[in-house]
């Protein structure tokens, strides 16, 4: 699991991007919301769960998980209590006959 800080200036808010399959920080580097630090997470060959205290300095945390990042967020962000969470185009079951890509296709 790779972590890349796009912004780490001690802002009051954090946007935690759990990026999708084959994506890295370049996918969102054009974003610069005022008042937010931004952490991108990708390359999920190894998973390292986040501890709650990792983000305790922030007044608010927004979790944005996209594609395969939805699966990774479900496994690594269990102790993170975001103020807002968005899962876009993904599932906690990426290879699943009912909720994801059918096993015969994958």
Cite the ranges covered by each PLM segment.
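Catalytic metal-binding/acid-base residues of hydrolase active sites
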Residues: 22, 69, 91
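Short hydrophobic segments within beta-strands
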Residues: 16-18, 64, 88
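Active-site catalytic motif of lipid deacylating hydrolases and related acyltransferases
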Residues: 1-58, 104-105
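Short, conserved loop/helix-junction motifs that constitute active-site signature segments
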Residues: 10, 79-80
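Hydrolases whose catalytic domains are alpha/beta-hydrolase-1, hotdog thioesterase
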Residues: 27, 72-76
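Gly/Ala-rich beta-loop-alpha elbow adjacent to hydrolase catalytic centers
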Residues: 64-73
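Short hydrophobic/aromatic-enriched beta-strand-loop microsegments
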Residues: 38-42, 83-88
């Amino acid at each position: 699991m790779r972590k890349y800080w796009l912004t780490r200036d001690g802002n009051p808010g954090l946007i935690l991007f759990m990026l999708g399959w084959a994506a890295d920080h370049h996918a969102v580097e054009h974003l610069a919301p005022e008042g937010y630090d931004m952490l991108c997470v990708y390359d999920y060959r190894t998973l390292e769960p986040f501890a709650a205290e990792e983000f305790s300095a922030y007044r608010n945390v927004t979790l944005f998980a996209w594609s395969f990042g939805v699966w990774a967020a479900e496994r690594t962000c269990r102790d993170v209590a975001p103020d807002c969470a968005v899962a876009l185009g993904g599932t906690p079951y990426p290879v699943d006959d009912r909720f994801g890509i059918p096993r015969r296709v994958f």
